[in-house]
Every structure is written in structure tokens, then in C-alpha cells.
């Protein structure tokens, strides 16, 4: 049996909380090694994207979570998928069986990927992450997180190992 997993997430500047991003960063390499396709939103591009409708008017900051499973079921909500959220947060989500909504959600994800996201990949020698994006001016490849400063990356590198999983 085969399966495909694709995720669209926000880079450091678009997250509500740097500690949550530090937790996500821990797993990027492993997810890529497992074949997960990672896309990270470029906040500055969301508002400029032509085909995103009301989503394009957002600032590119995220709190909502959405997932489509097998093209039949979707999850939409604000609940994080972690033990702390299950036990302590009052956020929620809806699980809806609807192939039509799943198709719409996947189409939106594809538009975001095409117009306002970098695809995260491993470098050819698999020693580092790279952020790839096609633009009208040509292909762009970055070796540092988009829209992040040296200080932000240093801070995340310092605090990342110190943040316990159950605090994320």
C-alpha cells in the first residue's frame, strides 16, 4: 500500500508562538526523510496571491488547522494535535465526512503551494534544508528560513532543545 502526506505550514514569522515553531523544526528533517512534502507559507506573498480569495486578505498568520484524509474526510479547527491541547485547551475542531469539502480544501492547499509557499527539501547531499520556490523571475532556492533574521534563527537554535515536548 502507498500513501502520500503533504503539509502546508507557516515559517517562523507567521507563527503565533516561537516555541511551537521550535517544536516543528525538530521534525522537519525526519518528515522529509519519510517522504512528507513540506510547504511553508511566505507571509509577504499571501496578500499578493491572486487566486486565494478571502484567504489572500489575511496577513499570512495562522491559528486554524485543516486536514483532508483520503479525499473524503476533513478536519477544521483551532485545536493543536498535541497532548497539552487535548488536556488543557478549550479549542476545538470539526471532523466532517464530505468528499466535496475535501476536494475544495485540497484545491486551496494547491493554490497556496503554487502562489505563496516554499517547498522545503533536503539539499542534494542531505546535509541541510533548502526552501524552493518558483517565481515569474525564475526559481529561488534559500538555505535559511524565509522571512527570518539571524537573531530569530539563533534564538530558535538556542531554545529549541530546551523546550519539552509536553509544553508545545
Give, region by region, the residue ranges found by the protein language model.
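PLD/PLD-like phosphodiesterase catalytic module centered on the HKD motif
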Residues: 2-168
Amino acid at each position: 500500500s502507498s500513501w502520500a502526506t503533504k503539509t502546508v505550514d507557516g515559517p517562523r514569522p507567521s507563527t503565533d508562538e516561537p516555541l511551537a515553531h521550535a517544536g516543528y523544526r525538530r521534525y522537519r528533517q525526519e518528515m522529509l526523510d519519510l517522504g512528507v512534502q513540506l510547504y511553508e507559507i511566505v507571509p509577504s506573498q499571501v496578500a499578493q496571491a491572486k487566486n486565494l480569495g478571502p484567504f489572500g486578505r489575511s496577513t499570512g498568520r495562522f491559528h486554524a488547522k485543516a486536514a483532508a484524509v483520503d479525499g473524503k474526510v476533513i478536519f477544521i479547527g483551532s485545536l493543536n494535535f498535541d497532548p497539552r491541547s487535548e488536556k488543557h485547551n478549550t479549542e476545538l475542531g470539526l471532523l466532517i465526512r464530505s468528499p466535496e469539502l475535501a476536494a475544495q480544501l485540497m484545491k486551496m492547499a494547491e493554490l497556496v503551494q503554487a502562489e505563496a509557499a516554499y517547498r522545503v527539501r533536503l539539499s542534494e547531499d542531505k546535509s541541510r534544508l533548502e526552501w524552493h520556490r518558483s517565481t515569474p523571475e525564475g526559481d529561488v532556492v534559500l538555505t535559511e528560513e524565509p522571512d527570518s533574521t539571524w537573531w530569530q534563527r539563533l534564538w530558535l537554535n538556542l531554545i529549541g532543545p530546551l523546550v519539552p515536548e509536553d509544553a508545545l
